[in-house]
Amino acid sequence: MSSYKYYDLIRKPIITEKTTALSEQNKYAFYVDKFAAKLTVKKAIEEIFKVKVKKVNILNVKGKNKRFKGIIGTQINRKKAIVTLEKDNNIDFAGGIK
């Protein structure tokens, strides 16, 4: 699989207080395509960020019910991947921001 398809597979990183605390344990969270499998997520992360992946956990997140201007709607369902890296690897999302 070429690298441009890997970029389509990984939607965006999840940067919250909880995932920032996980990054100290070499775990990083990403929203991925809803048809993504563990093996393809592992290959995509290794190809894009040039790191060695130890383990991938995937979970489906159900969309919340929301009200907008009196109309009840539903947010989209998402798939979340929590990627554990090998010991000496890390991903820097900030990229030199001070």
Curated annotation (Swiss-Prot):
Keywords: Ribonucleoprotein, Ribosomal protein, RNA-binding, rRNA-binding
Record-level Gene Ontology MF annotations: rRNA binding; structural constituent of ribosome
Cellular component terms per the entry's GO annotation: ribonucleoprotein complex; ribosome
Keyword Ribonucleoprotein included in the entry's annotation: yes
GO BP: translation
Pfam family of the protein (one): Ribosomal_L23
InterPro entries: Nucleotide-bd_a/b_plait_sf, Ribosomal_uL23-like, Ribosomal_uL23/eL15/eS24_sf
Similarity-based family: Belongs to the universal ribosomal protein uL23 family.
Assembly with partners or alone: Part of the 50S ribosomal subunit. Contacts protein L29, and trigger factor when it is bound to the ribosome.
Biological function: One of the early assembly proteins it binds 23S rRNA. One of the proteins that surrounds the polypeptide exit tunnel on the outside of the ribosome. Forms the main docking site for trigger factor binding to the ribosome.
PANTHER family per the UniProt record, alphabetical: 60S RIBOSOMAL PROTEIN L23A
UniProt-recorded name of the protein: Large ribosomal subunit protein uL23
Protein source organism: Rickettsia canadensis (strain McKiel)
Gene that encodes the chain: rplW
